[in-house]
């Protein structure tokens, strides 16, 4: 409520910290209950914000890729793509192949597979923002994903019909990723439909 009252914004992103794992319950049959419980909690938070800022506030929720690619893994995350698509204005899958231990040379195919898994649901791509990784957290020490790789991933998404994508994190102080190199991939002019 304090955030809604004292800050100006148009939407809320519930990040990937909103999870309940398979050890946070009393049994296997509570998987769906956990998923619905977290959605209910975020709806309560959203409504508190909308009561102050108005009904135009948009909602989005991050989601791990695994529950999309392997729906049975909902038990590990309490995340379900179909539930998210109906509960939020936007669903934001973490399209982060390196974080999922996918070898770099297989990352383009992995992204394509993720897009196709979302696309089987009618209208889902119009409510989905794919979040690429700009940092490789698996490396020790952590380092930035090469600009060339990030651009390549953006092109893979575009070639698969994706119009809504972004990246995380943005290290603007160190210009990582380099804006001059990735900016062209945010233009809709190149997009295959040229829309």
Where are these regions (language model features)?
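Aromatic-lined carbohydrate-recognition surfaces of secreted/lumenal glycan-active proteins
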Residues: 13-17, 34-78, 125-137, 168-170
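Active-site groove signature of glycoside hydrolases
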Residues: 1-31, 166
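Hydrophobic transmembrane signal anchors and adjacent membrane-proximal interface regions, especially
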Residues: 11, 29-30, 37-40, 120, ...
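Substrate-binding cleft of secreted/luminal carbohydrate-active enzymes
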Residues: 10, 87-107, 111-112, 117, ...
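Alpha-helix N-cap and loop-to-helix initiation/capping positions
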Residues: 29-40, 72-79, 105-113, 142-149
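Substrate-binding cleft/loops of secretory-pathway carbohydrate-active enzymes
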Residues: 22, 57-100, 139-145
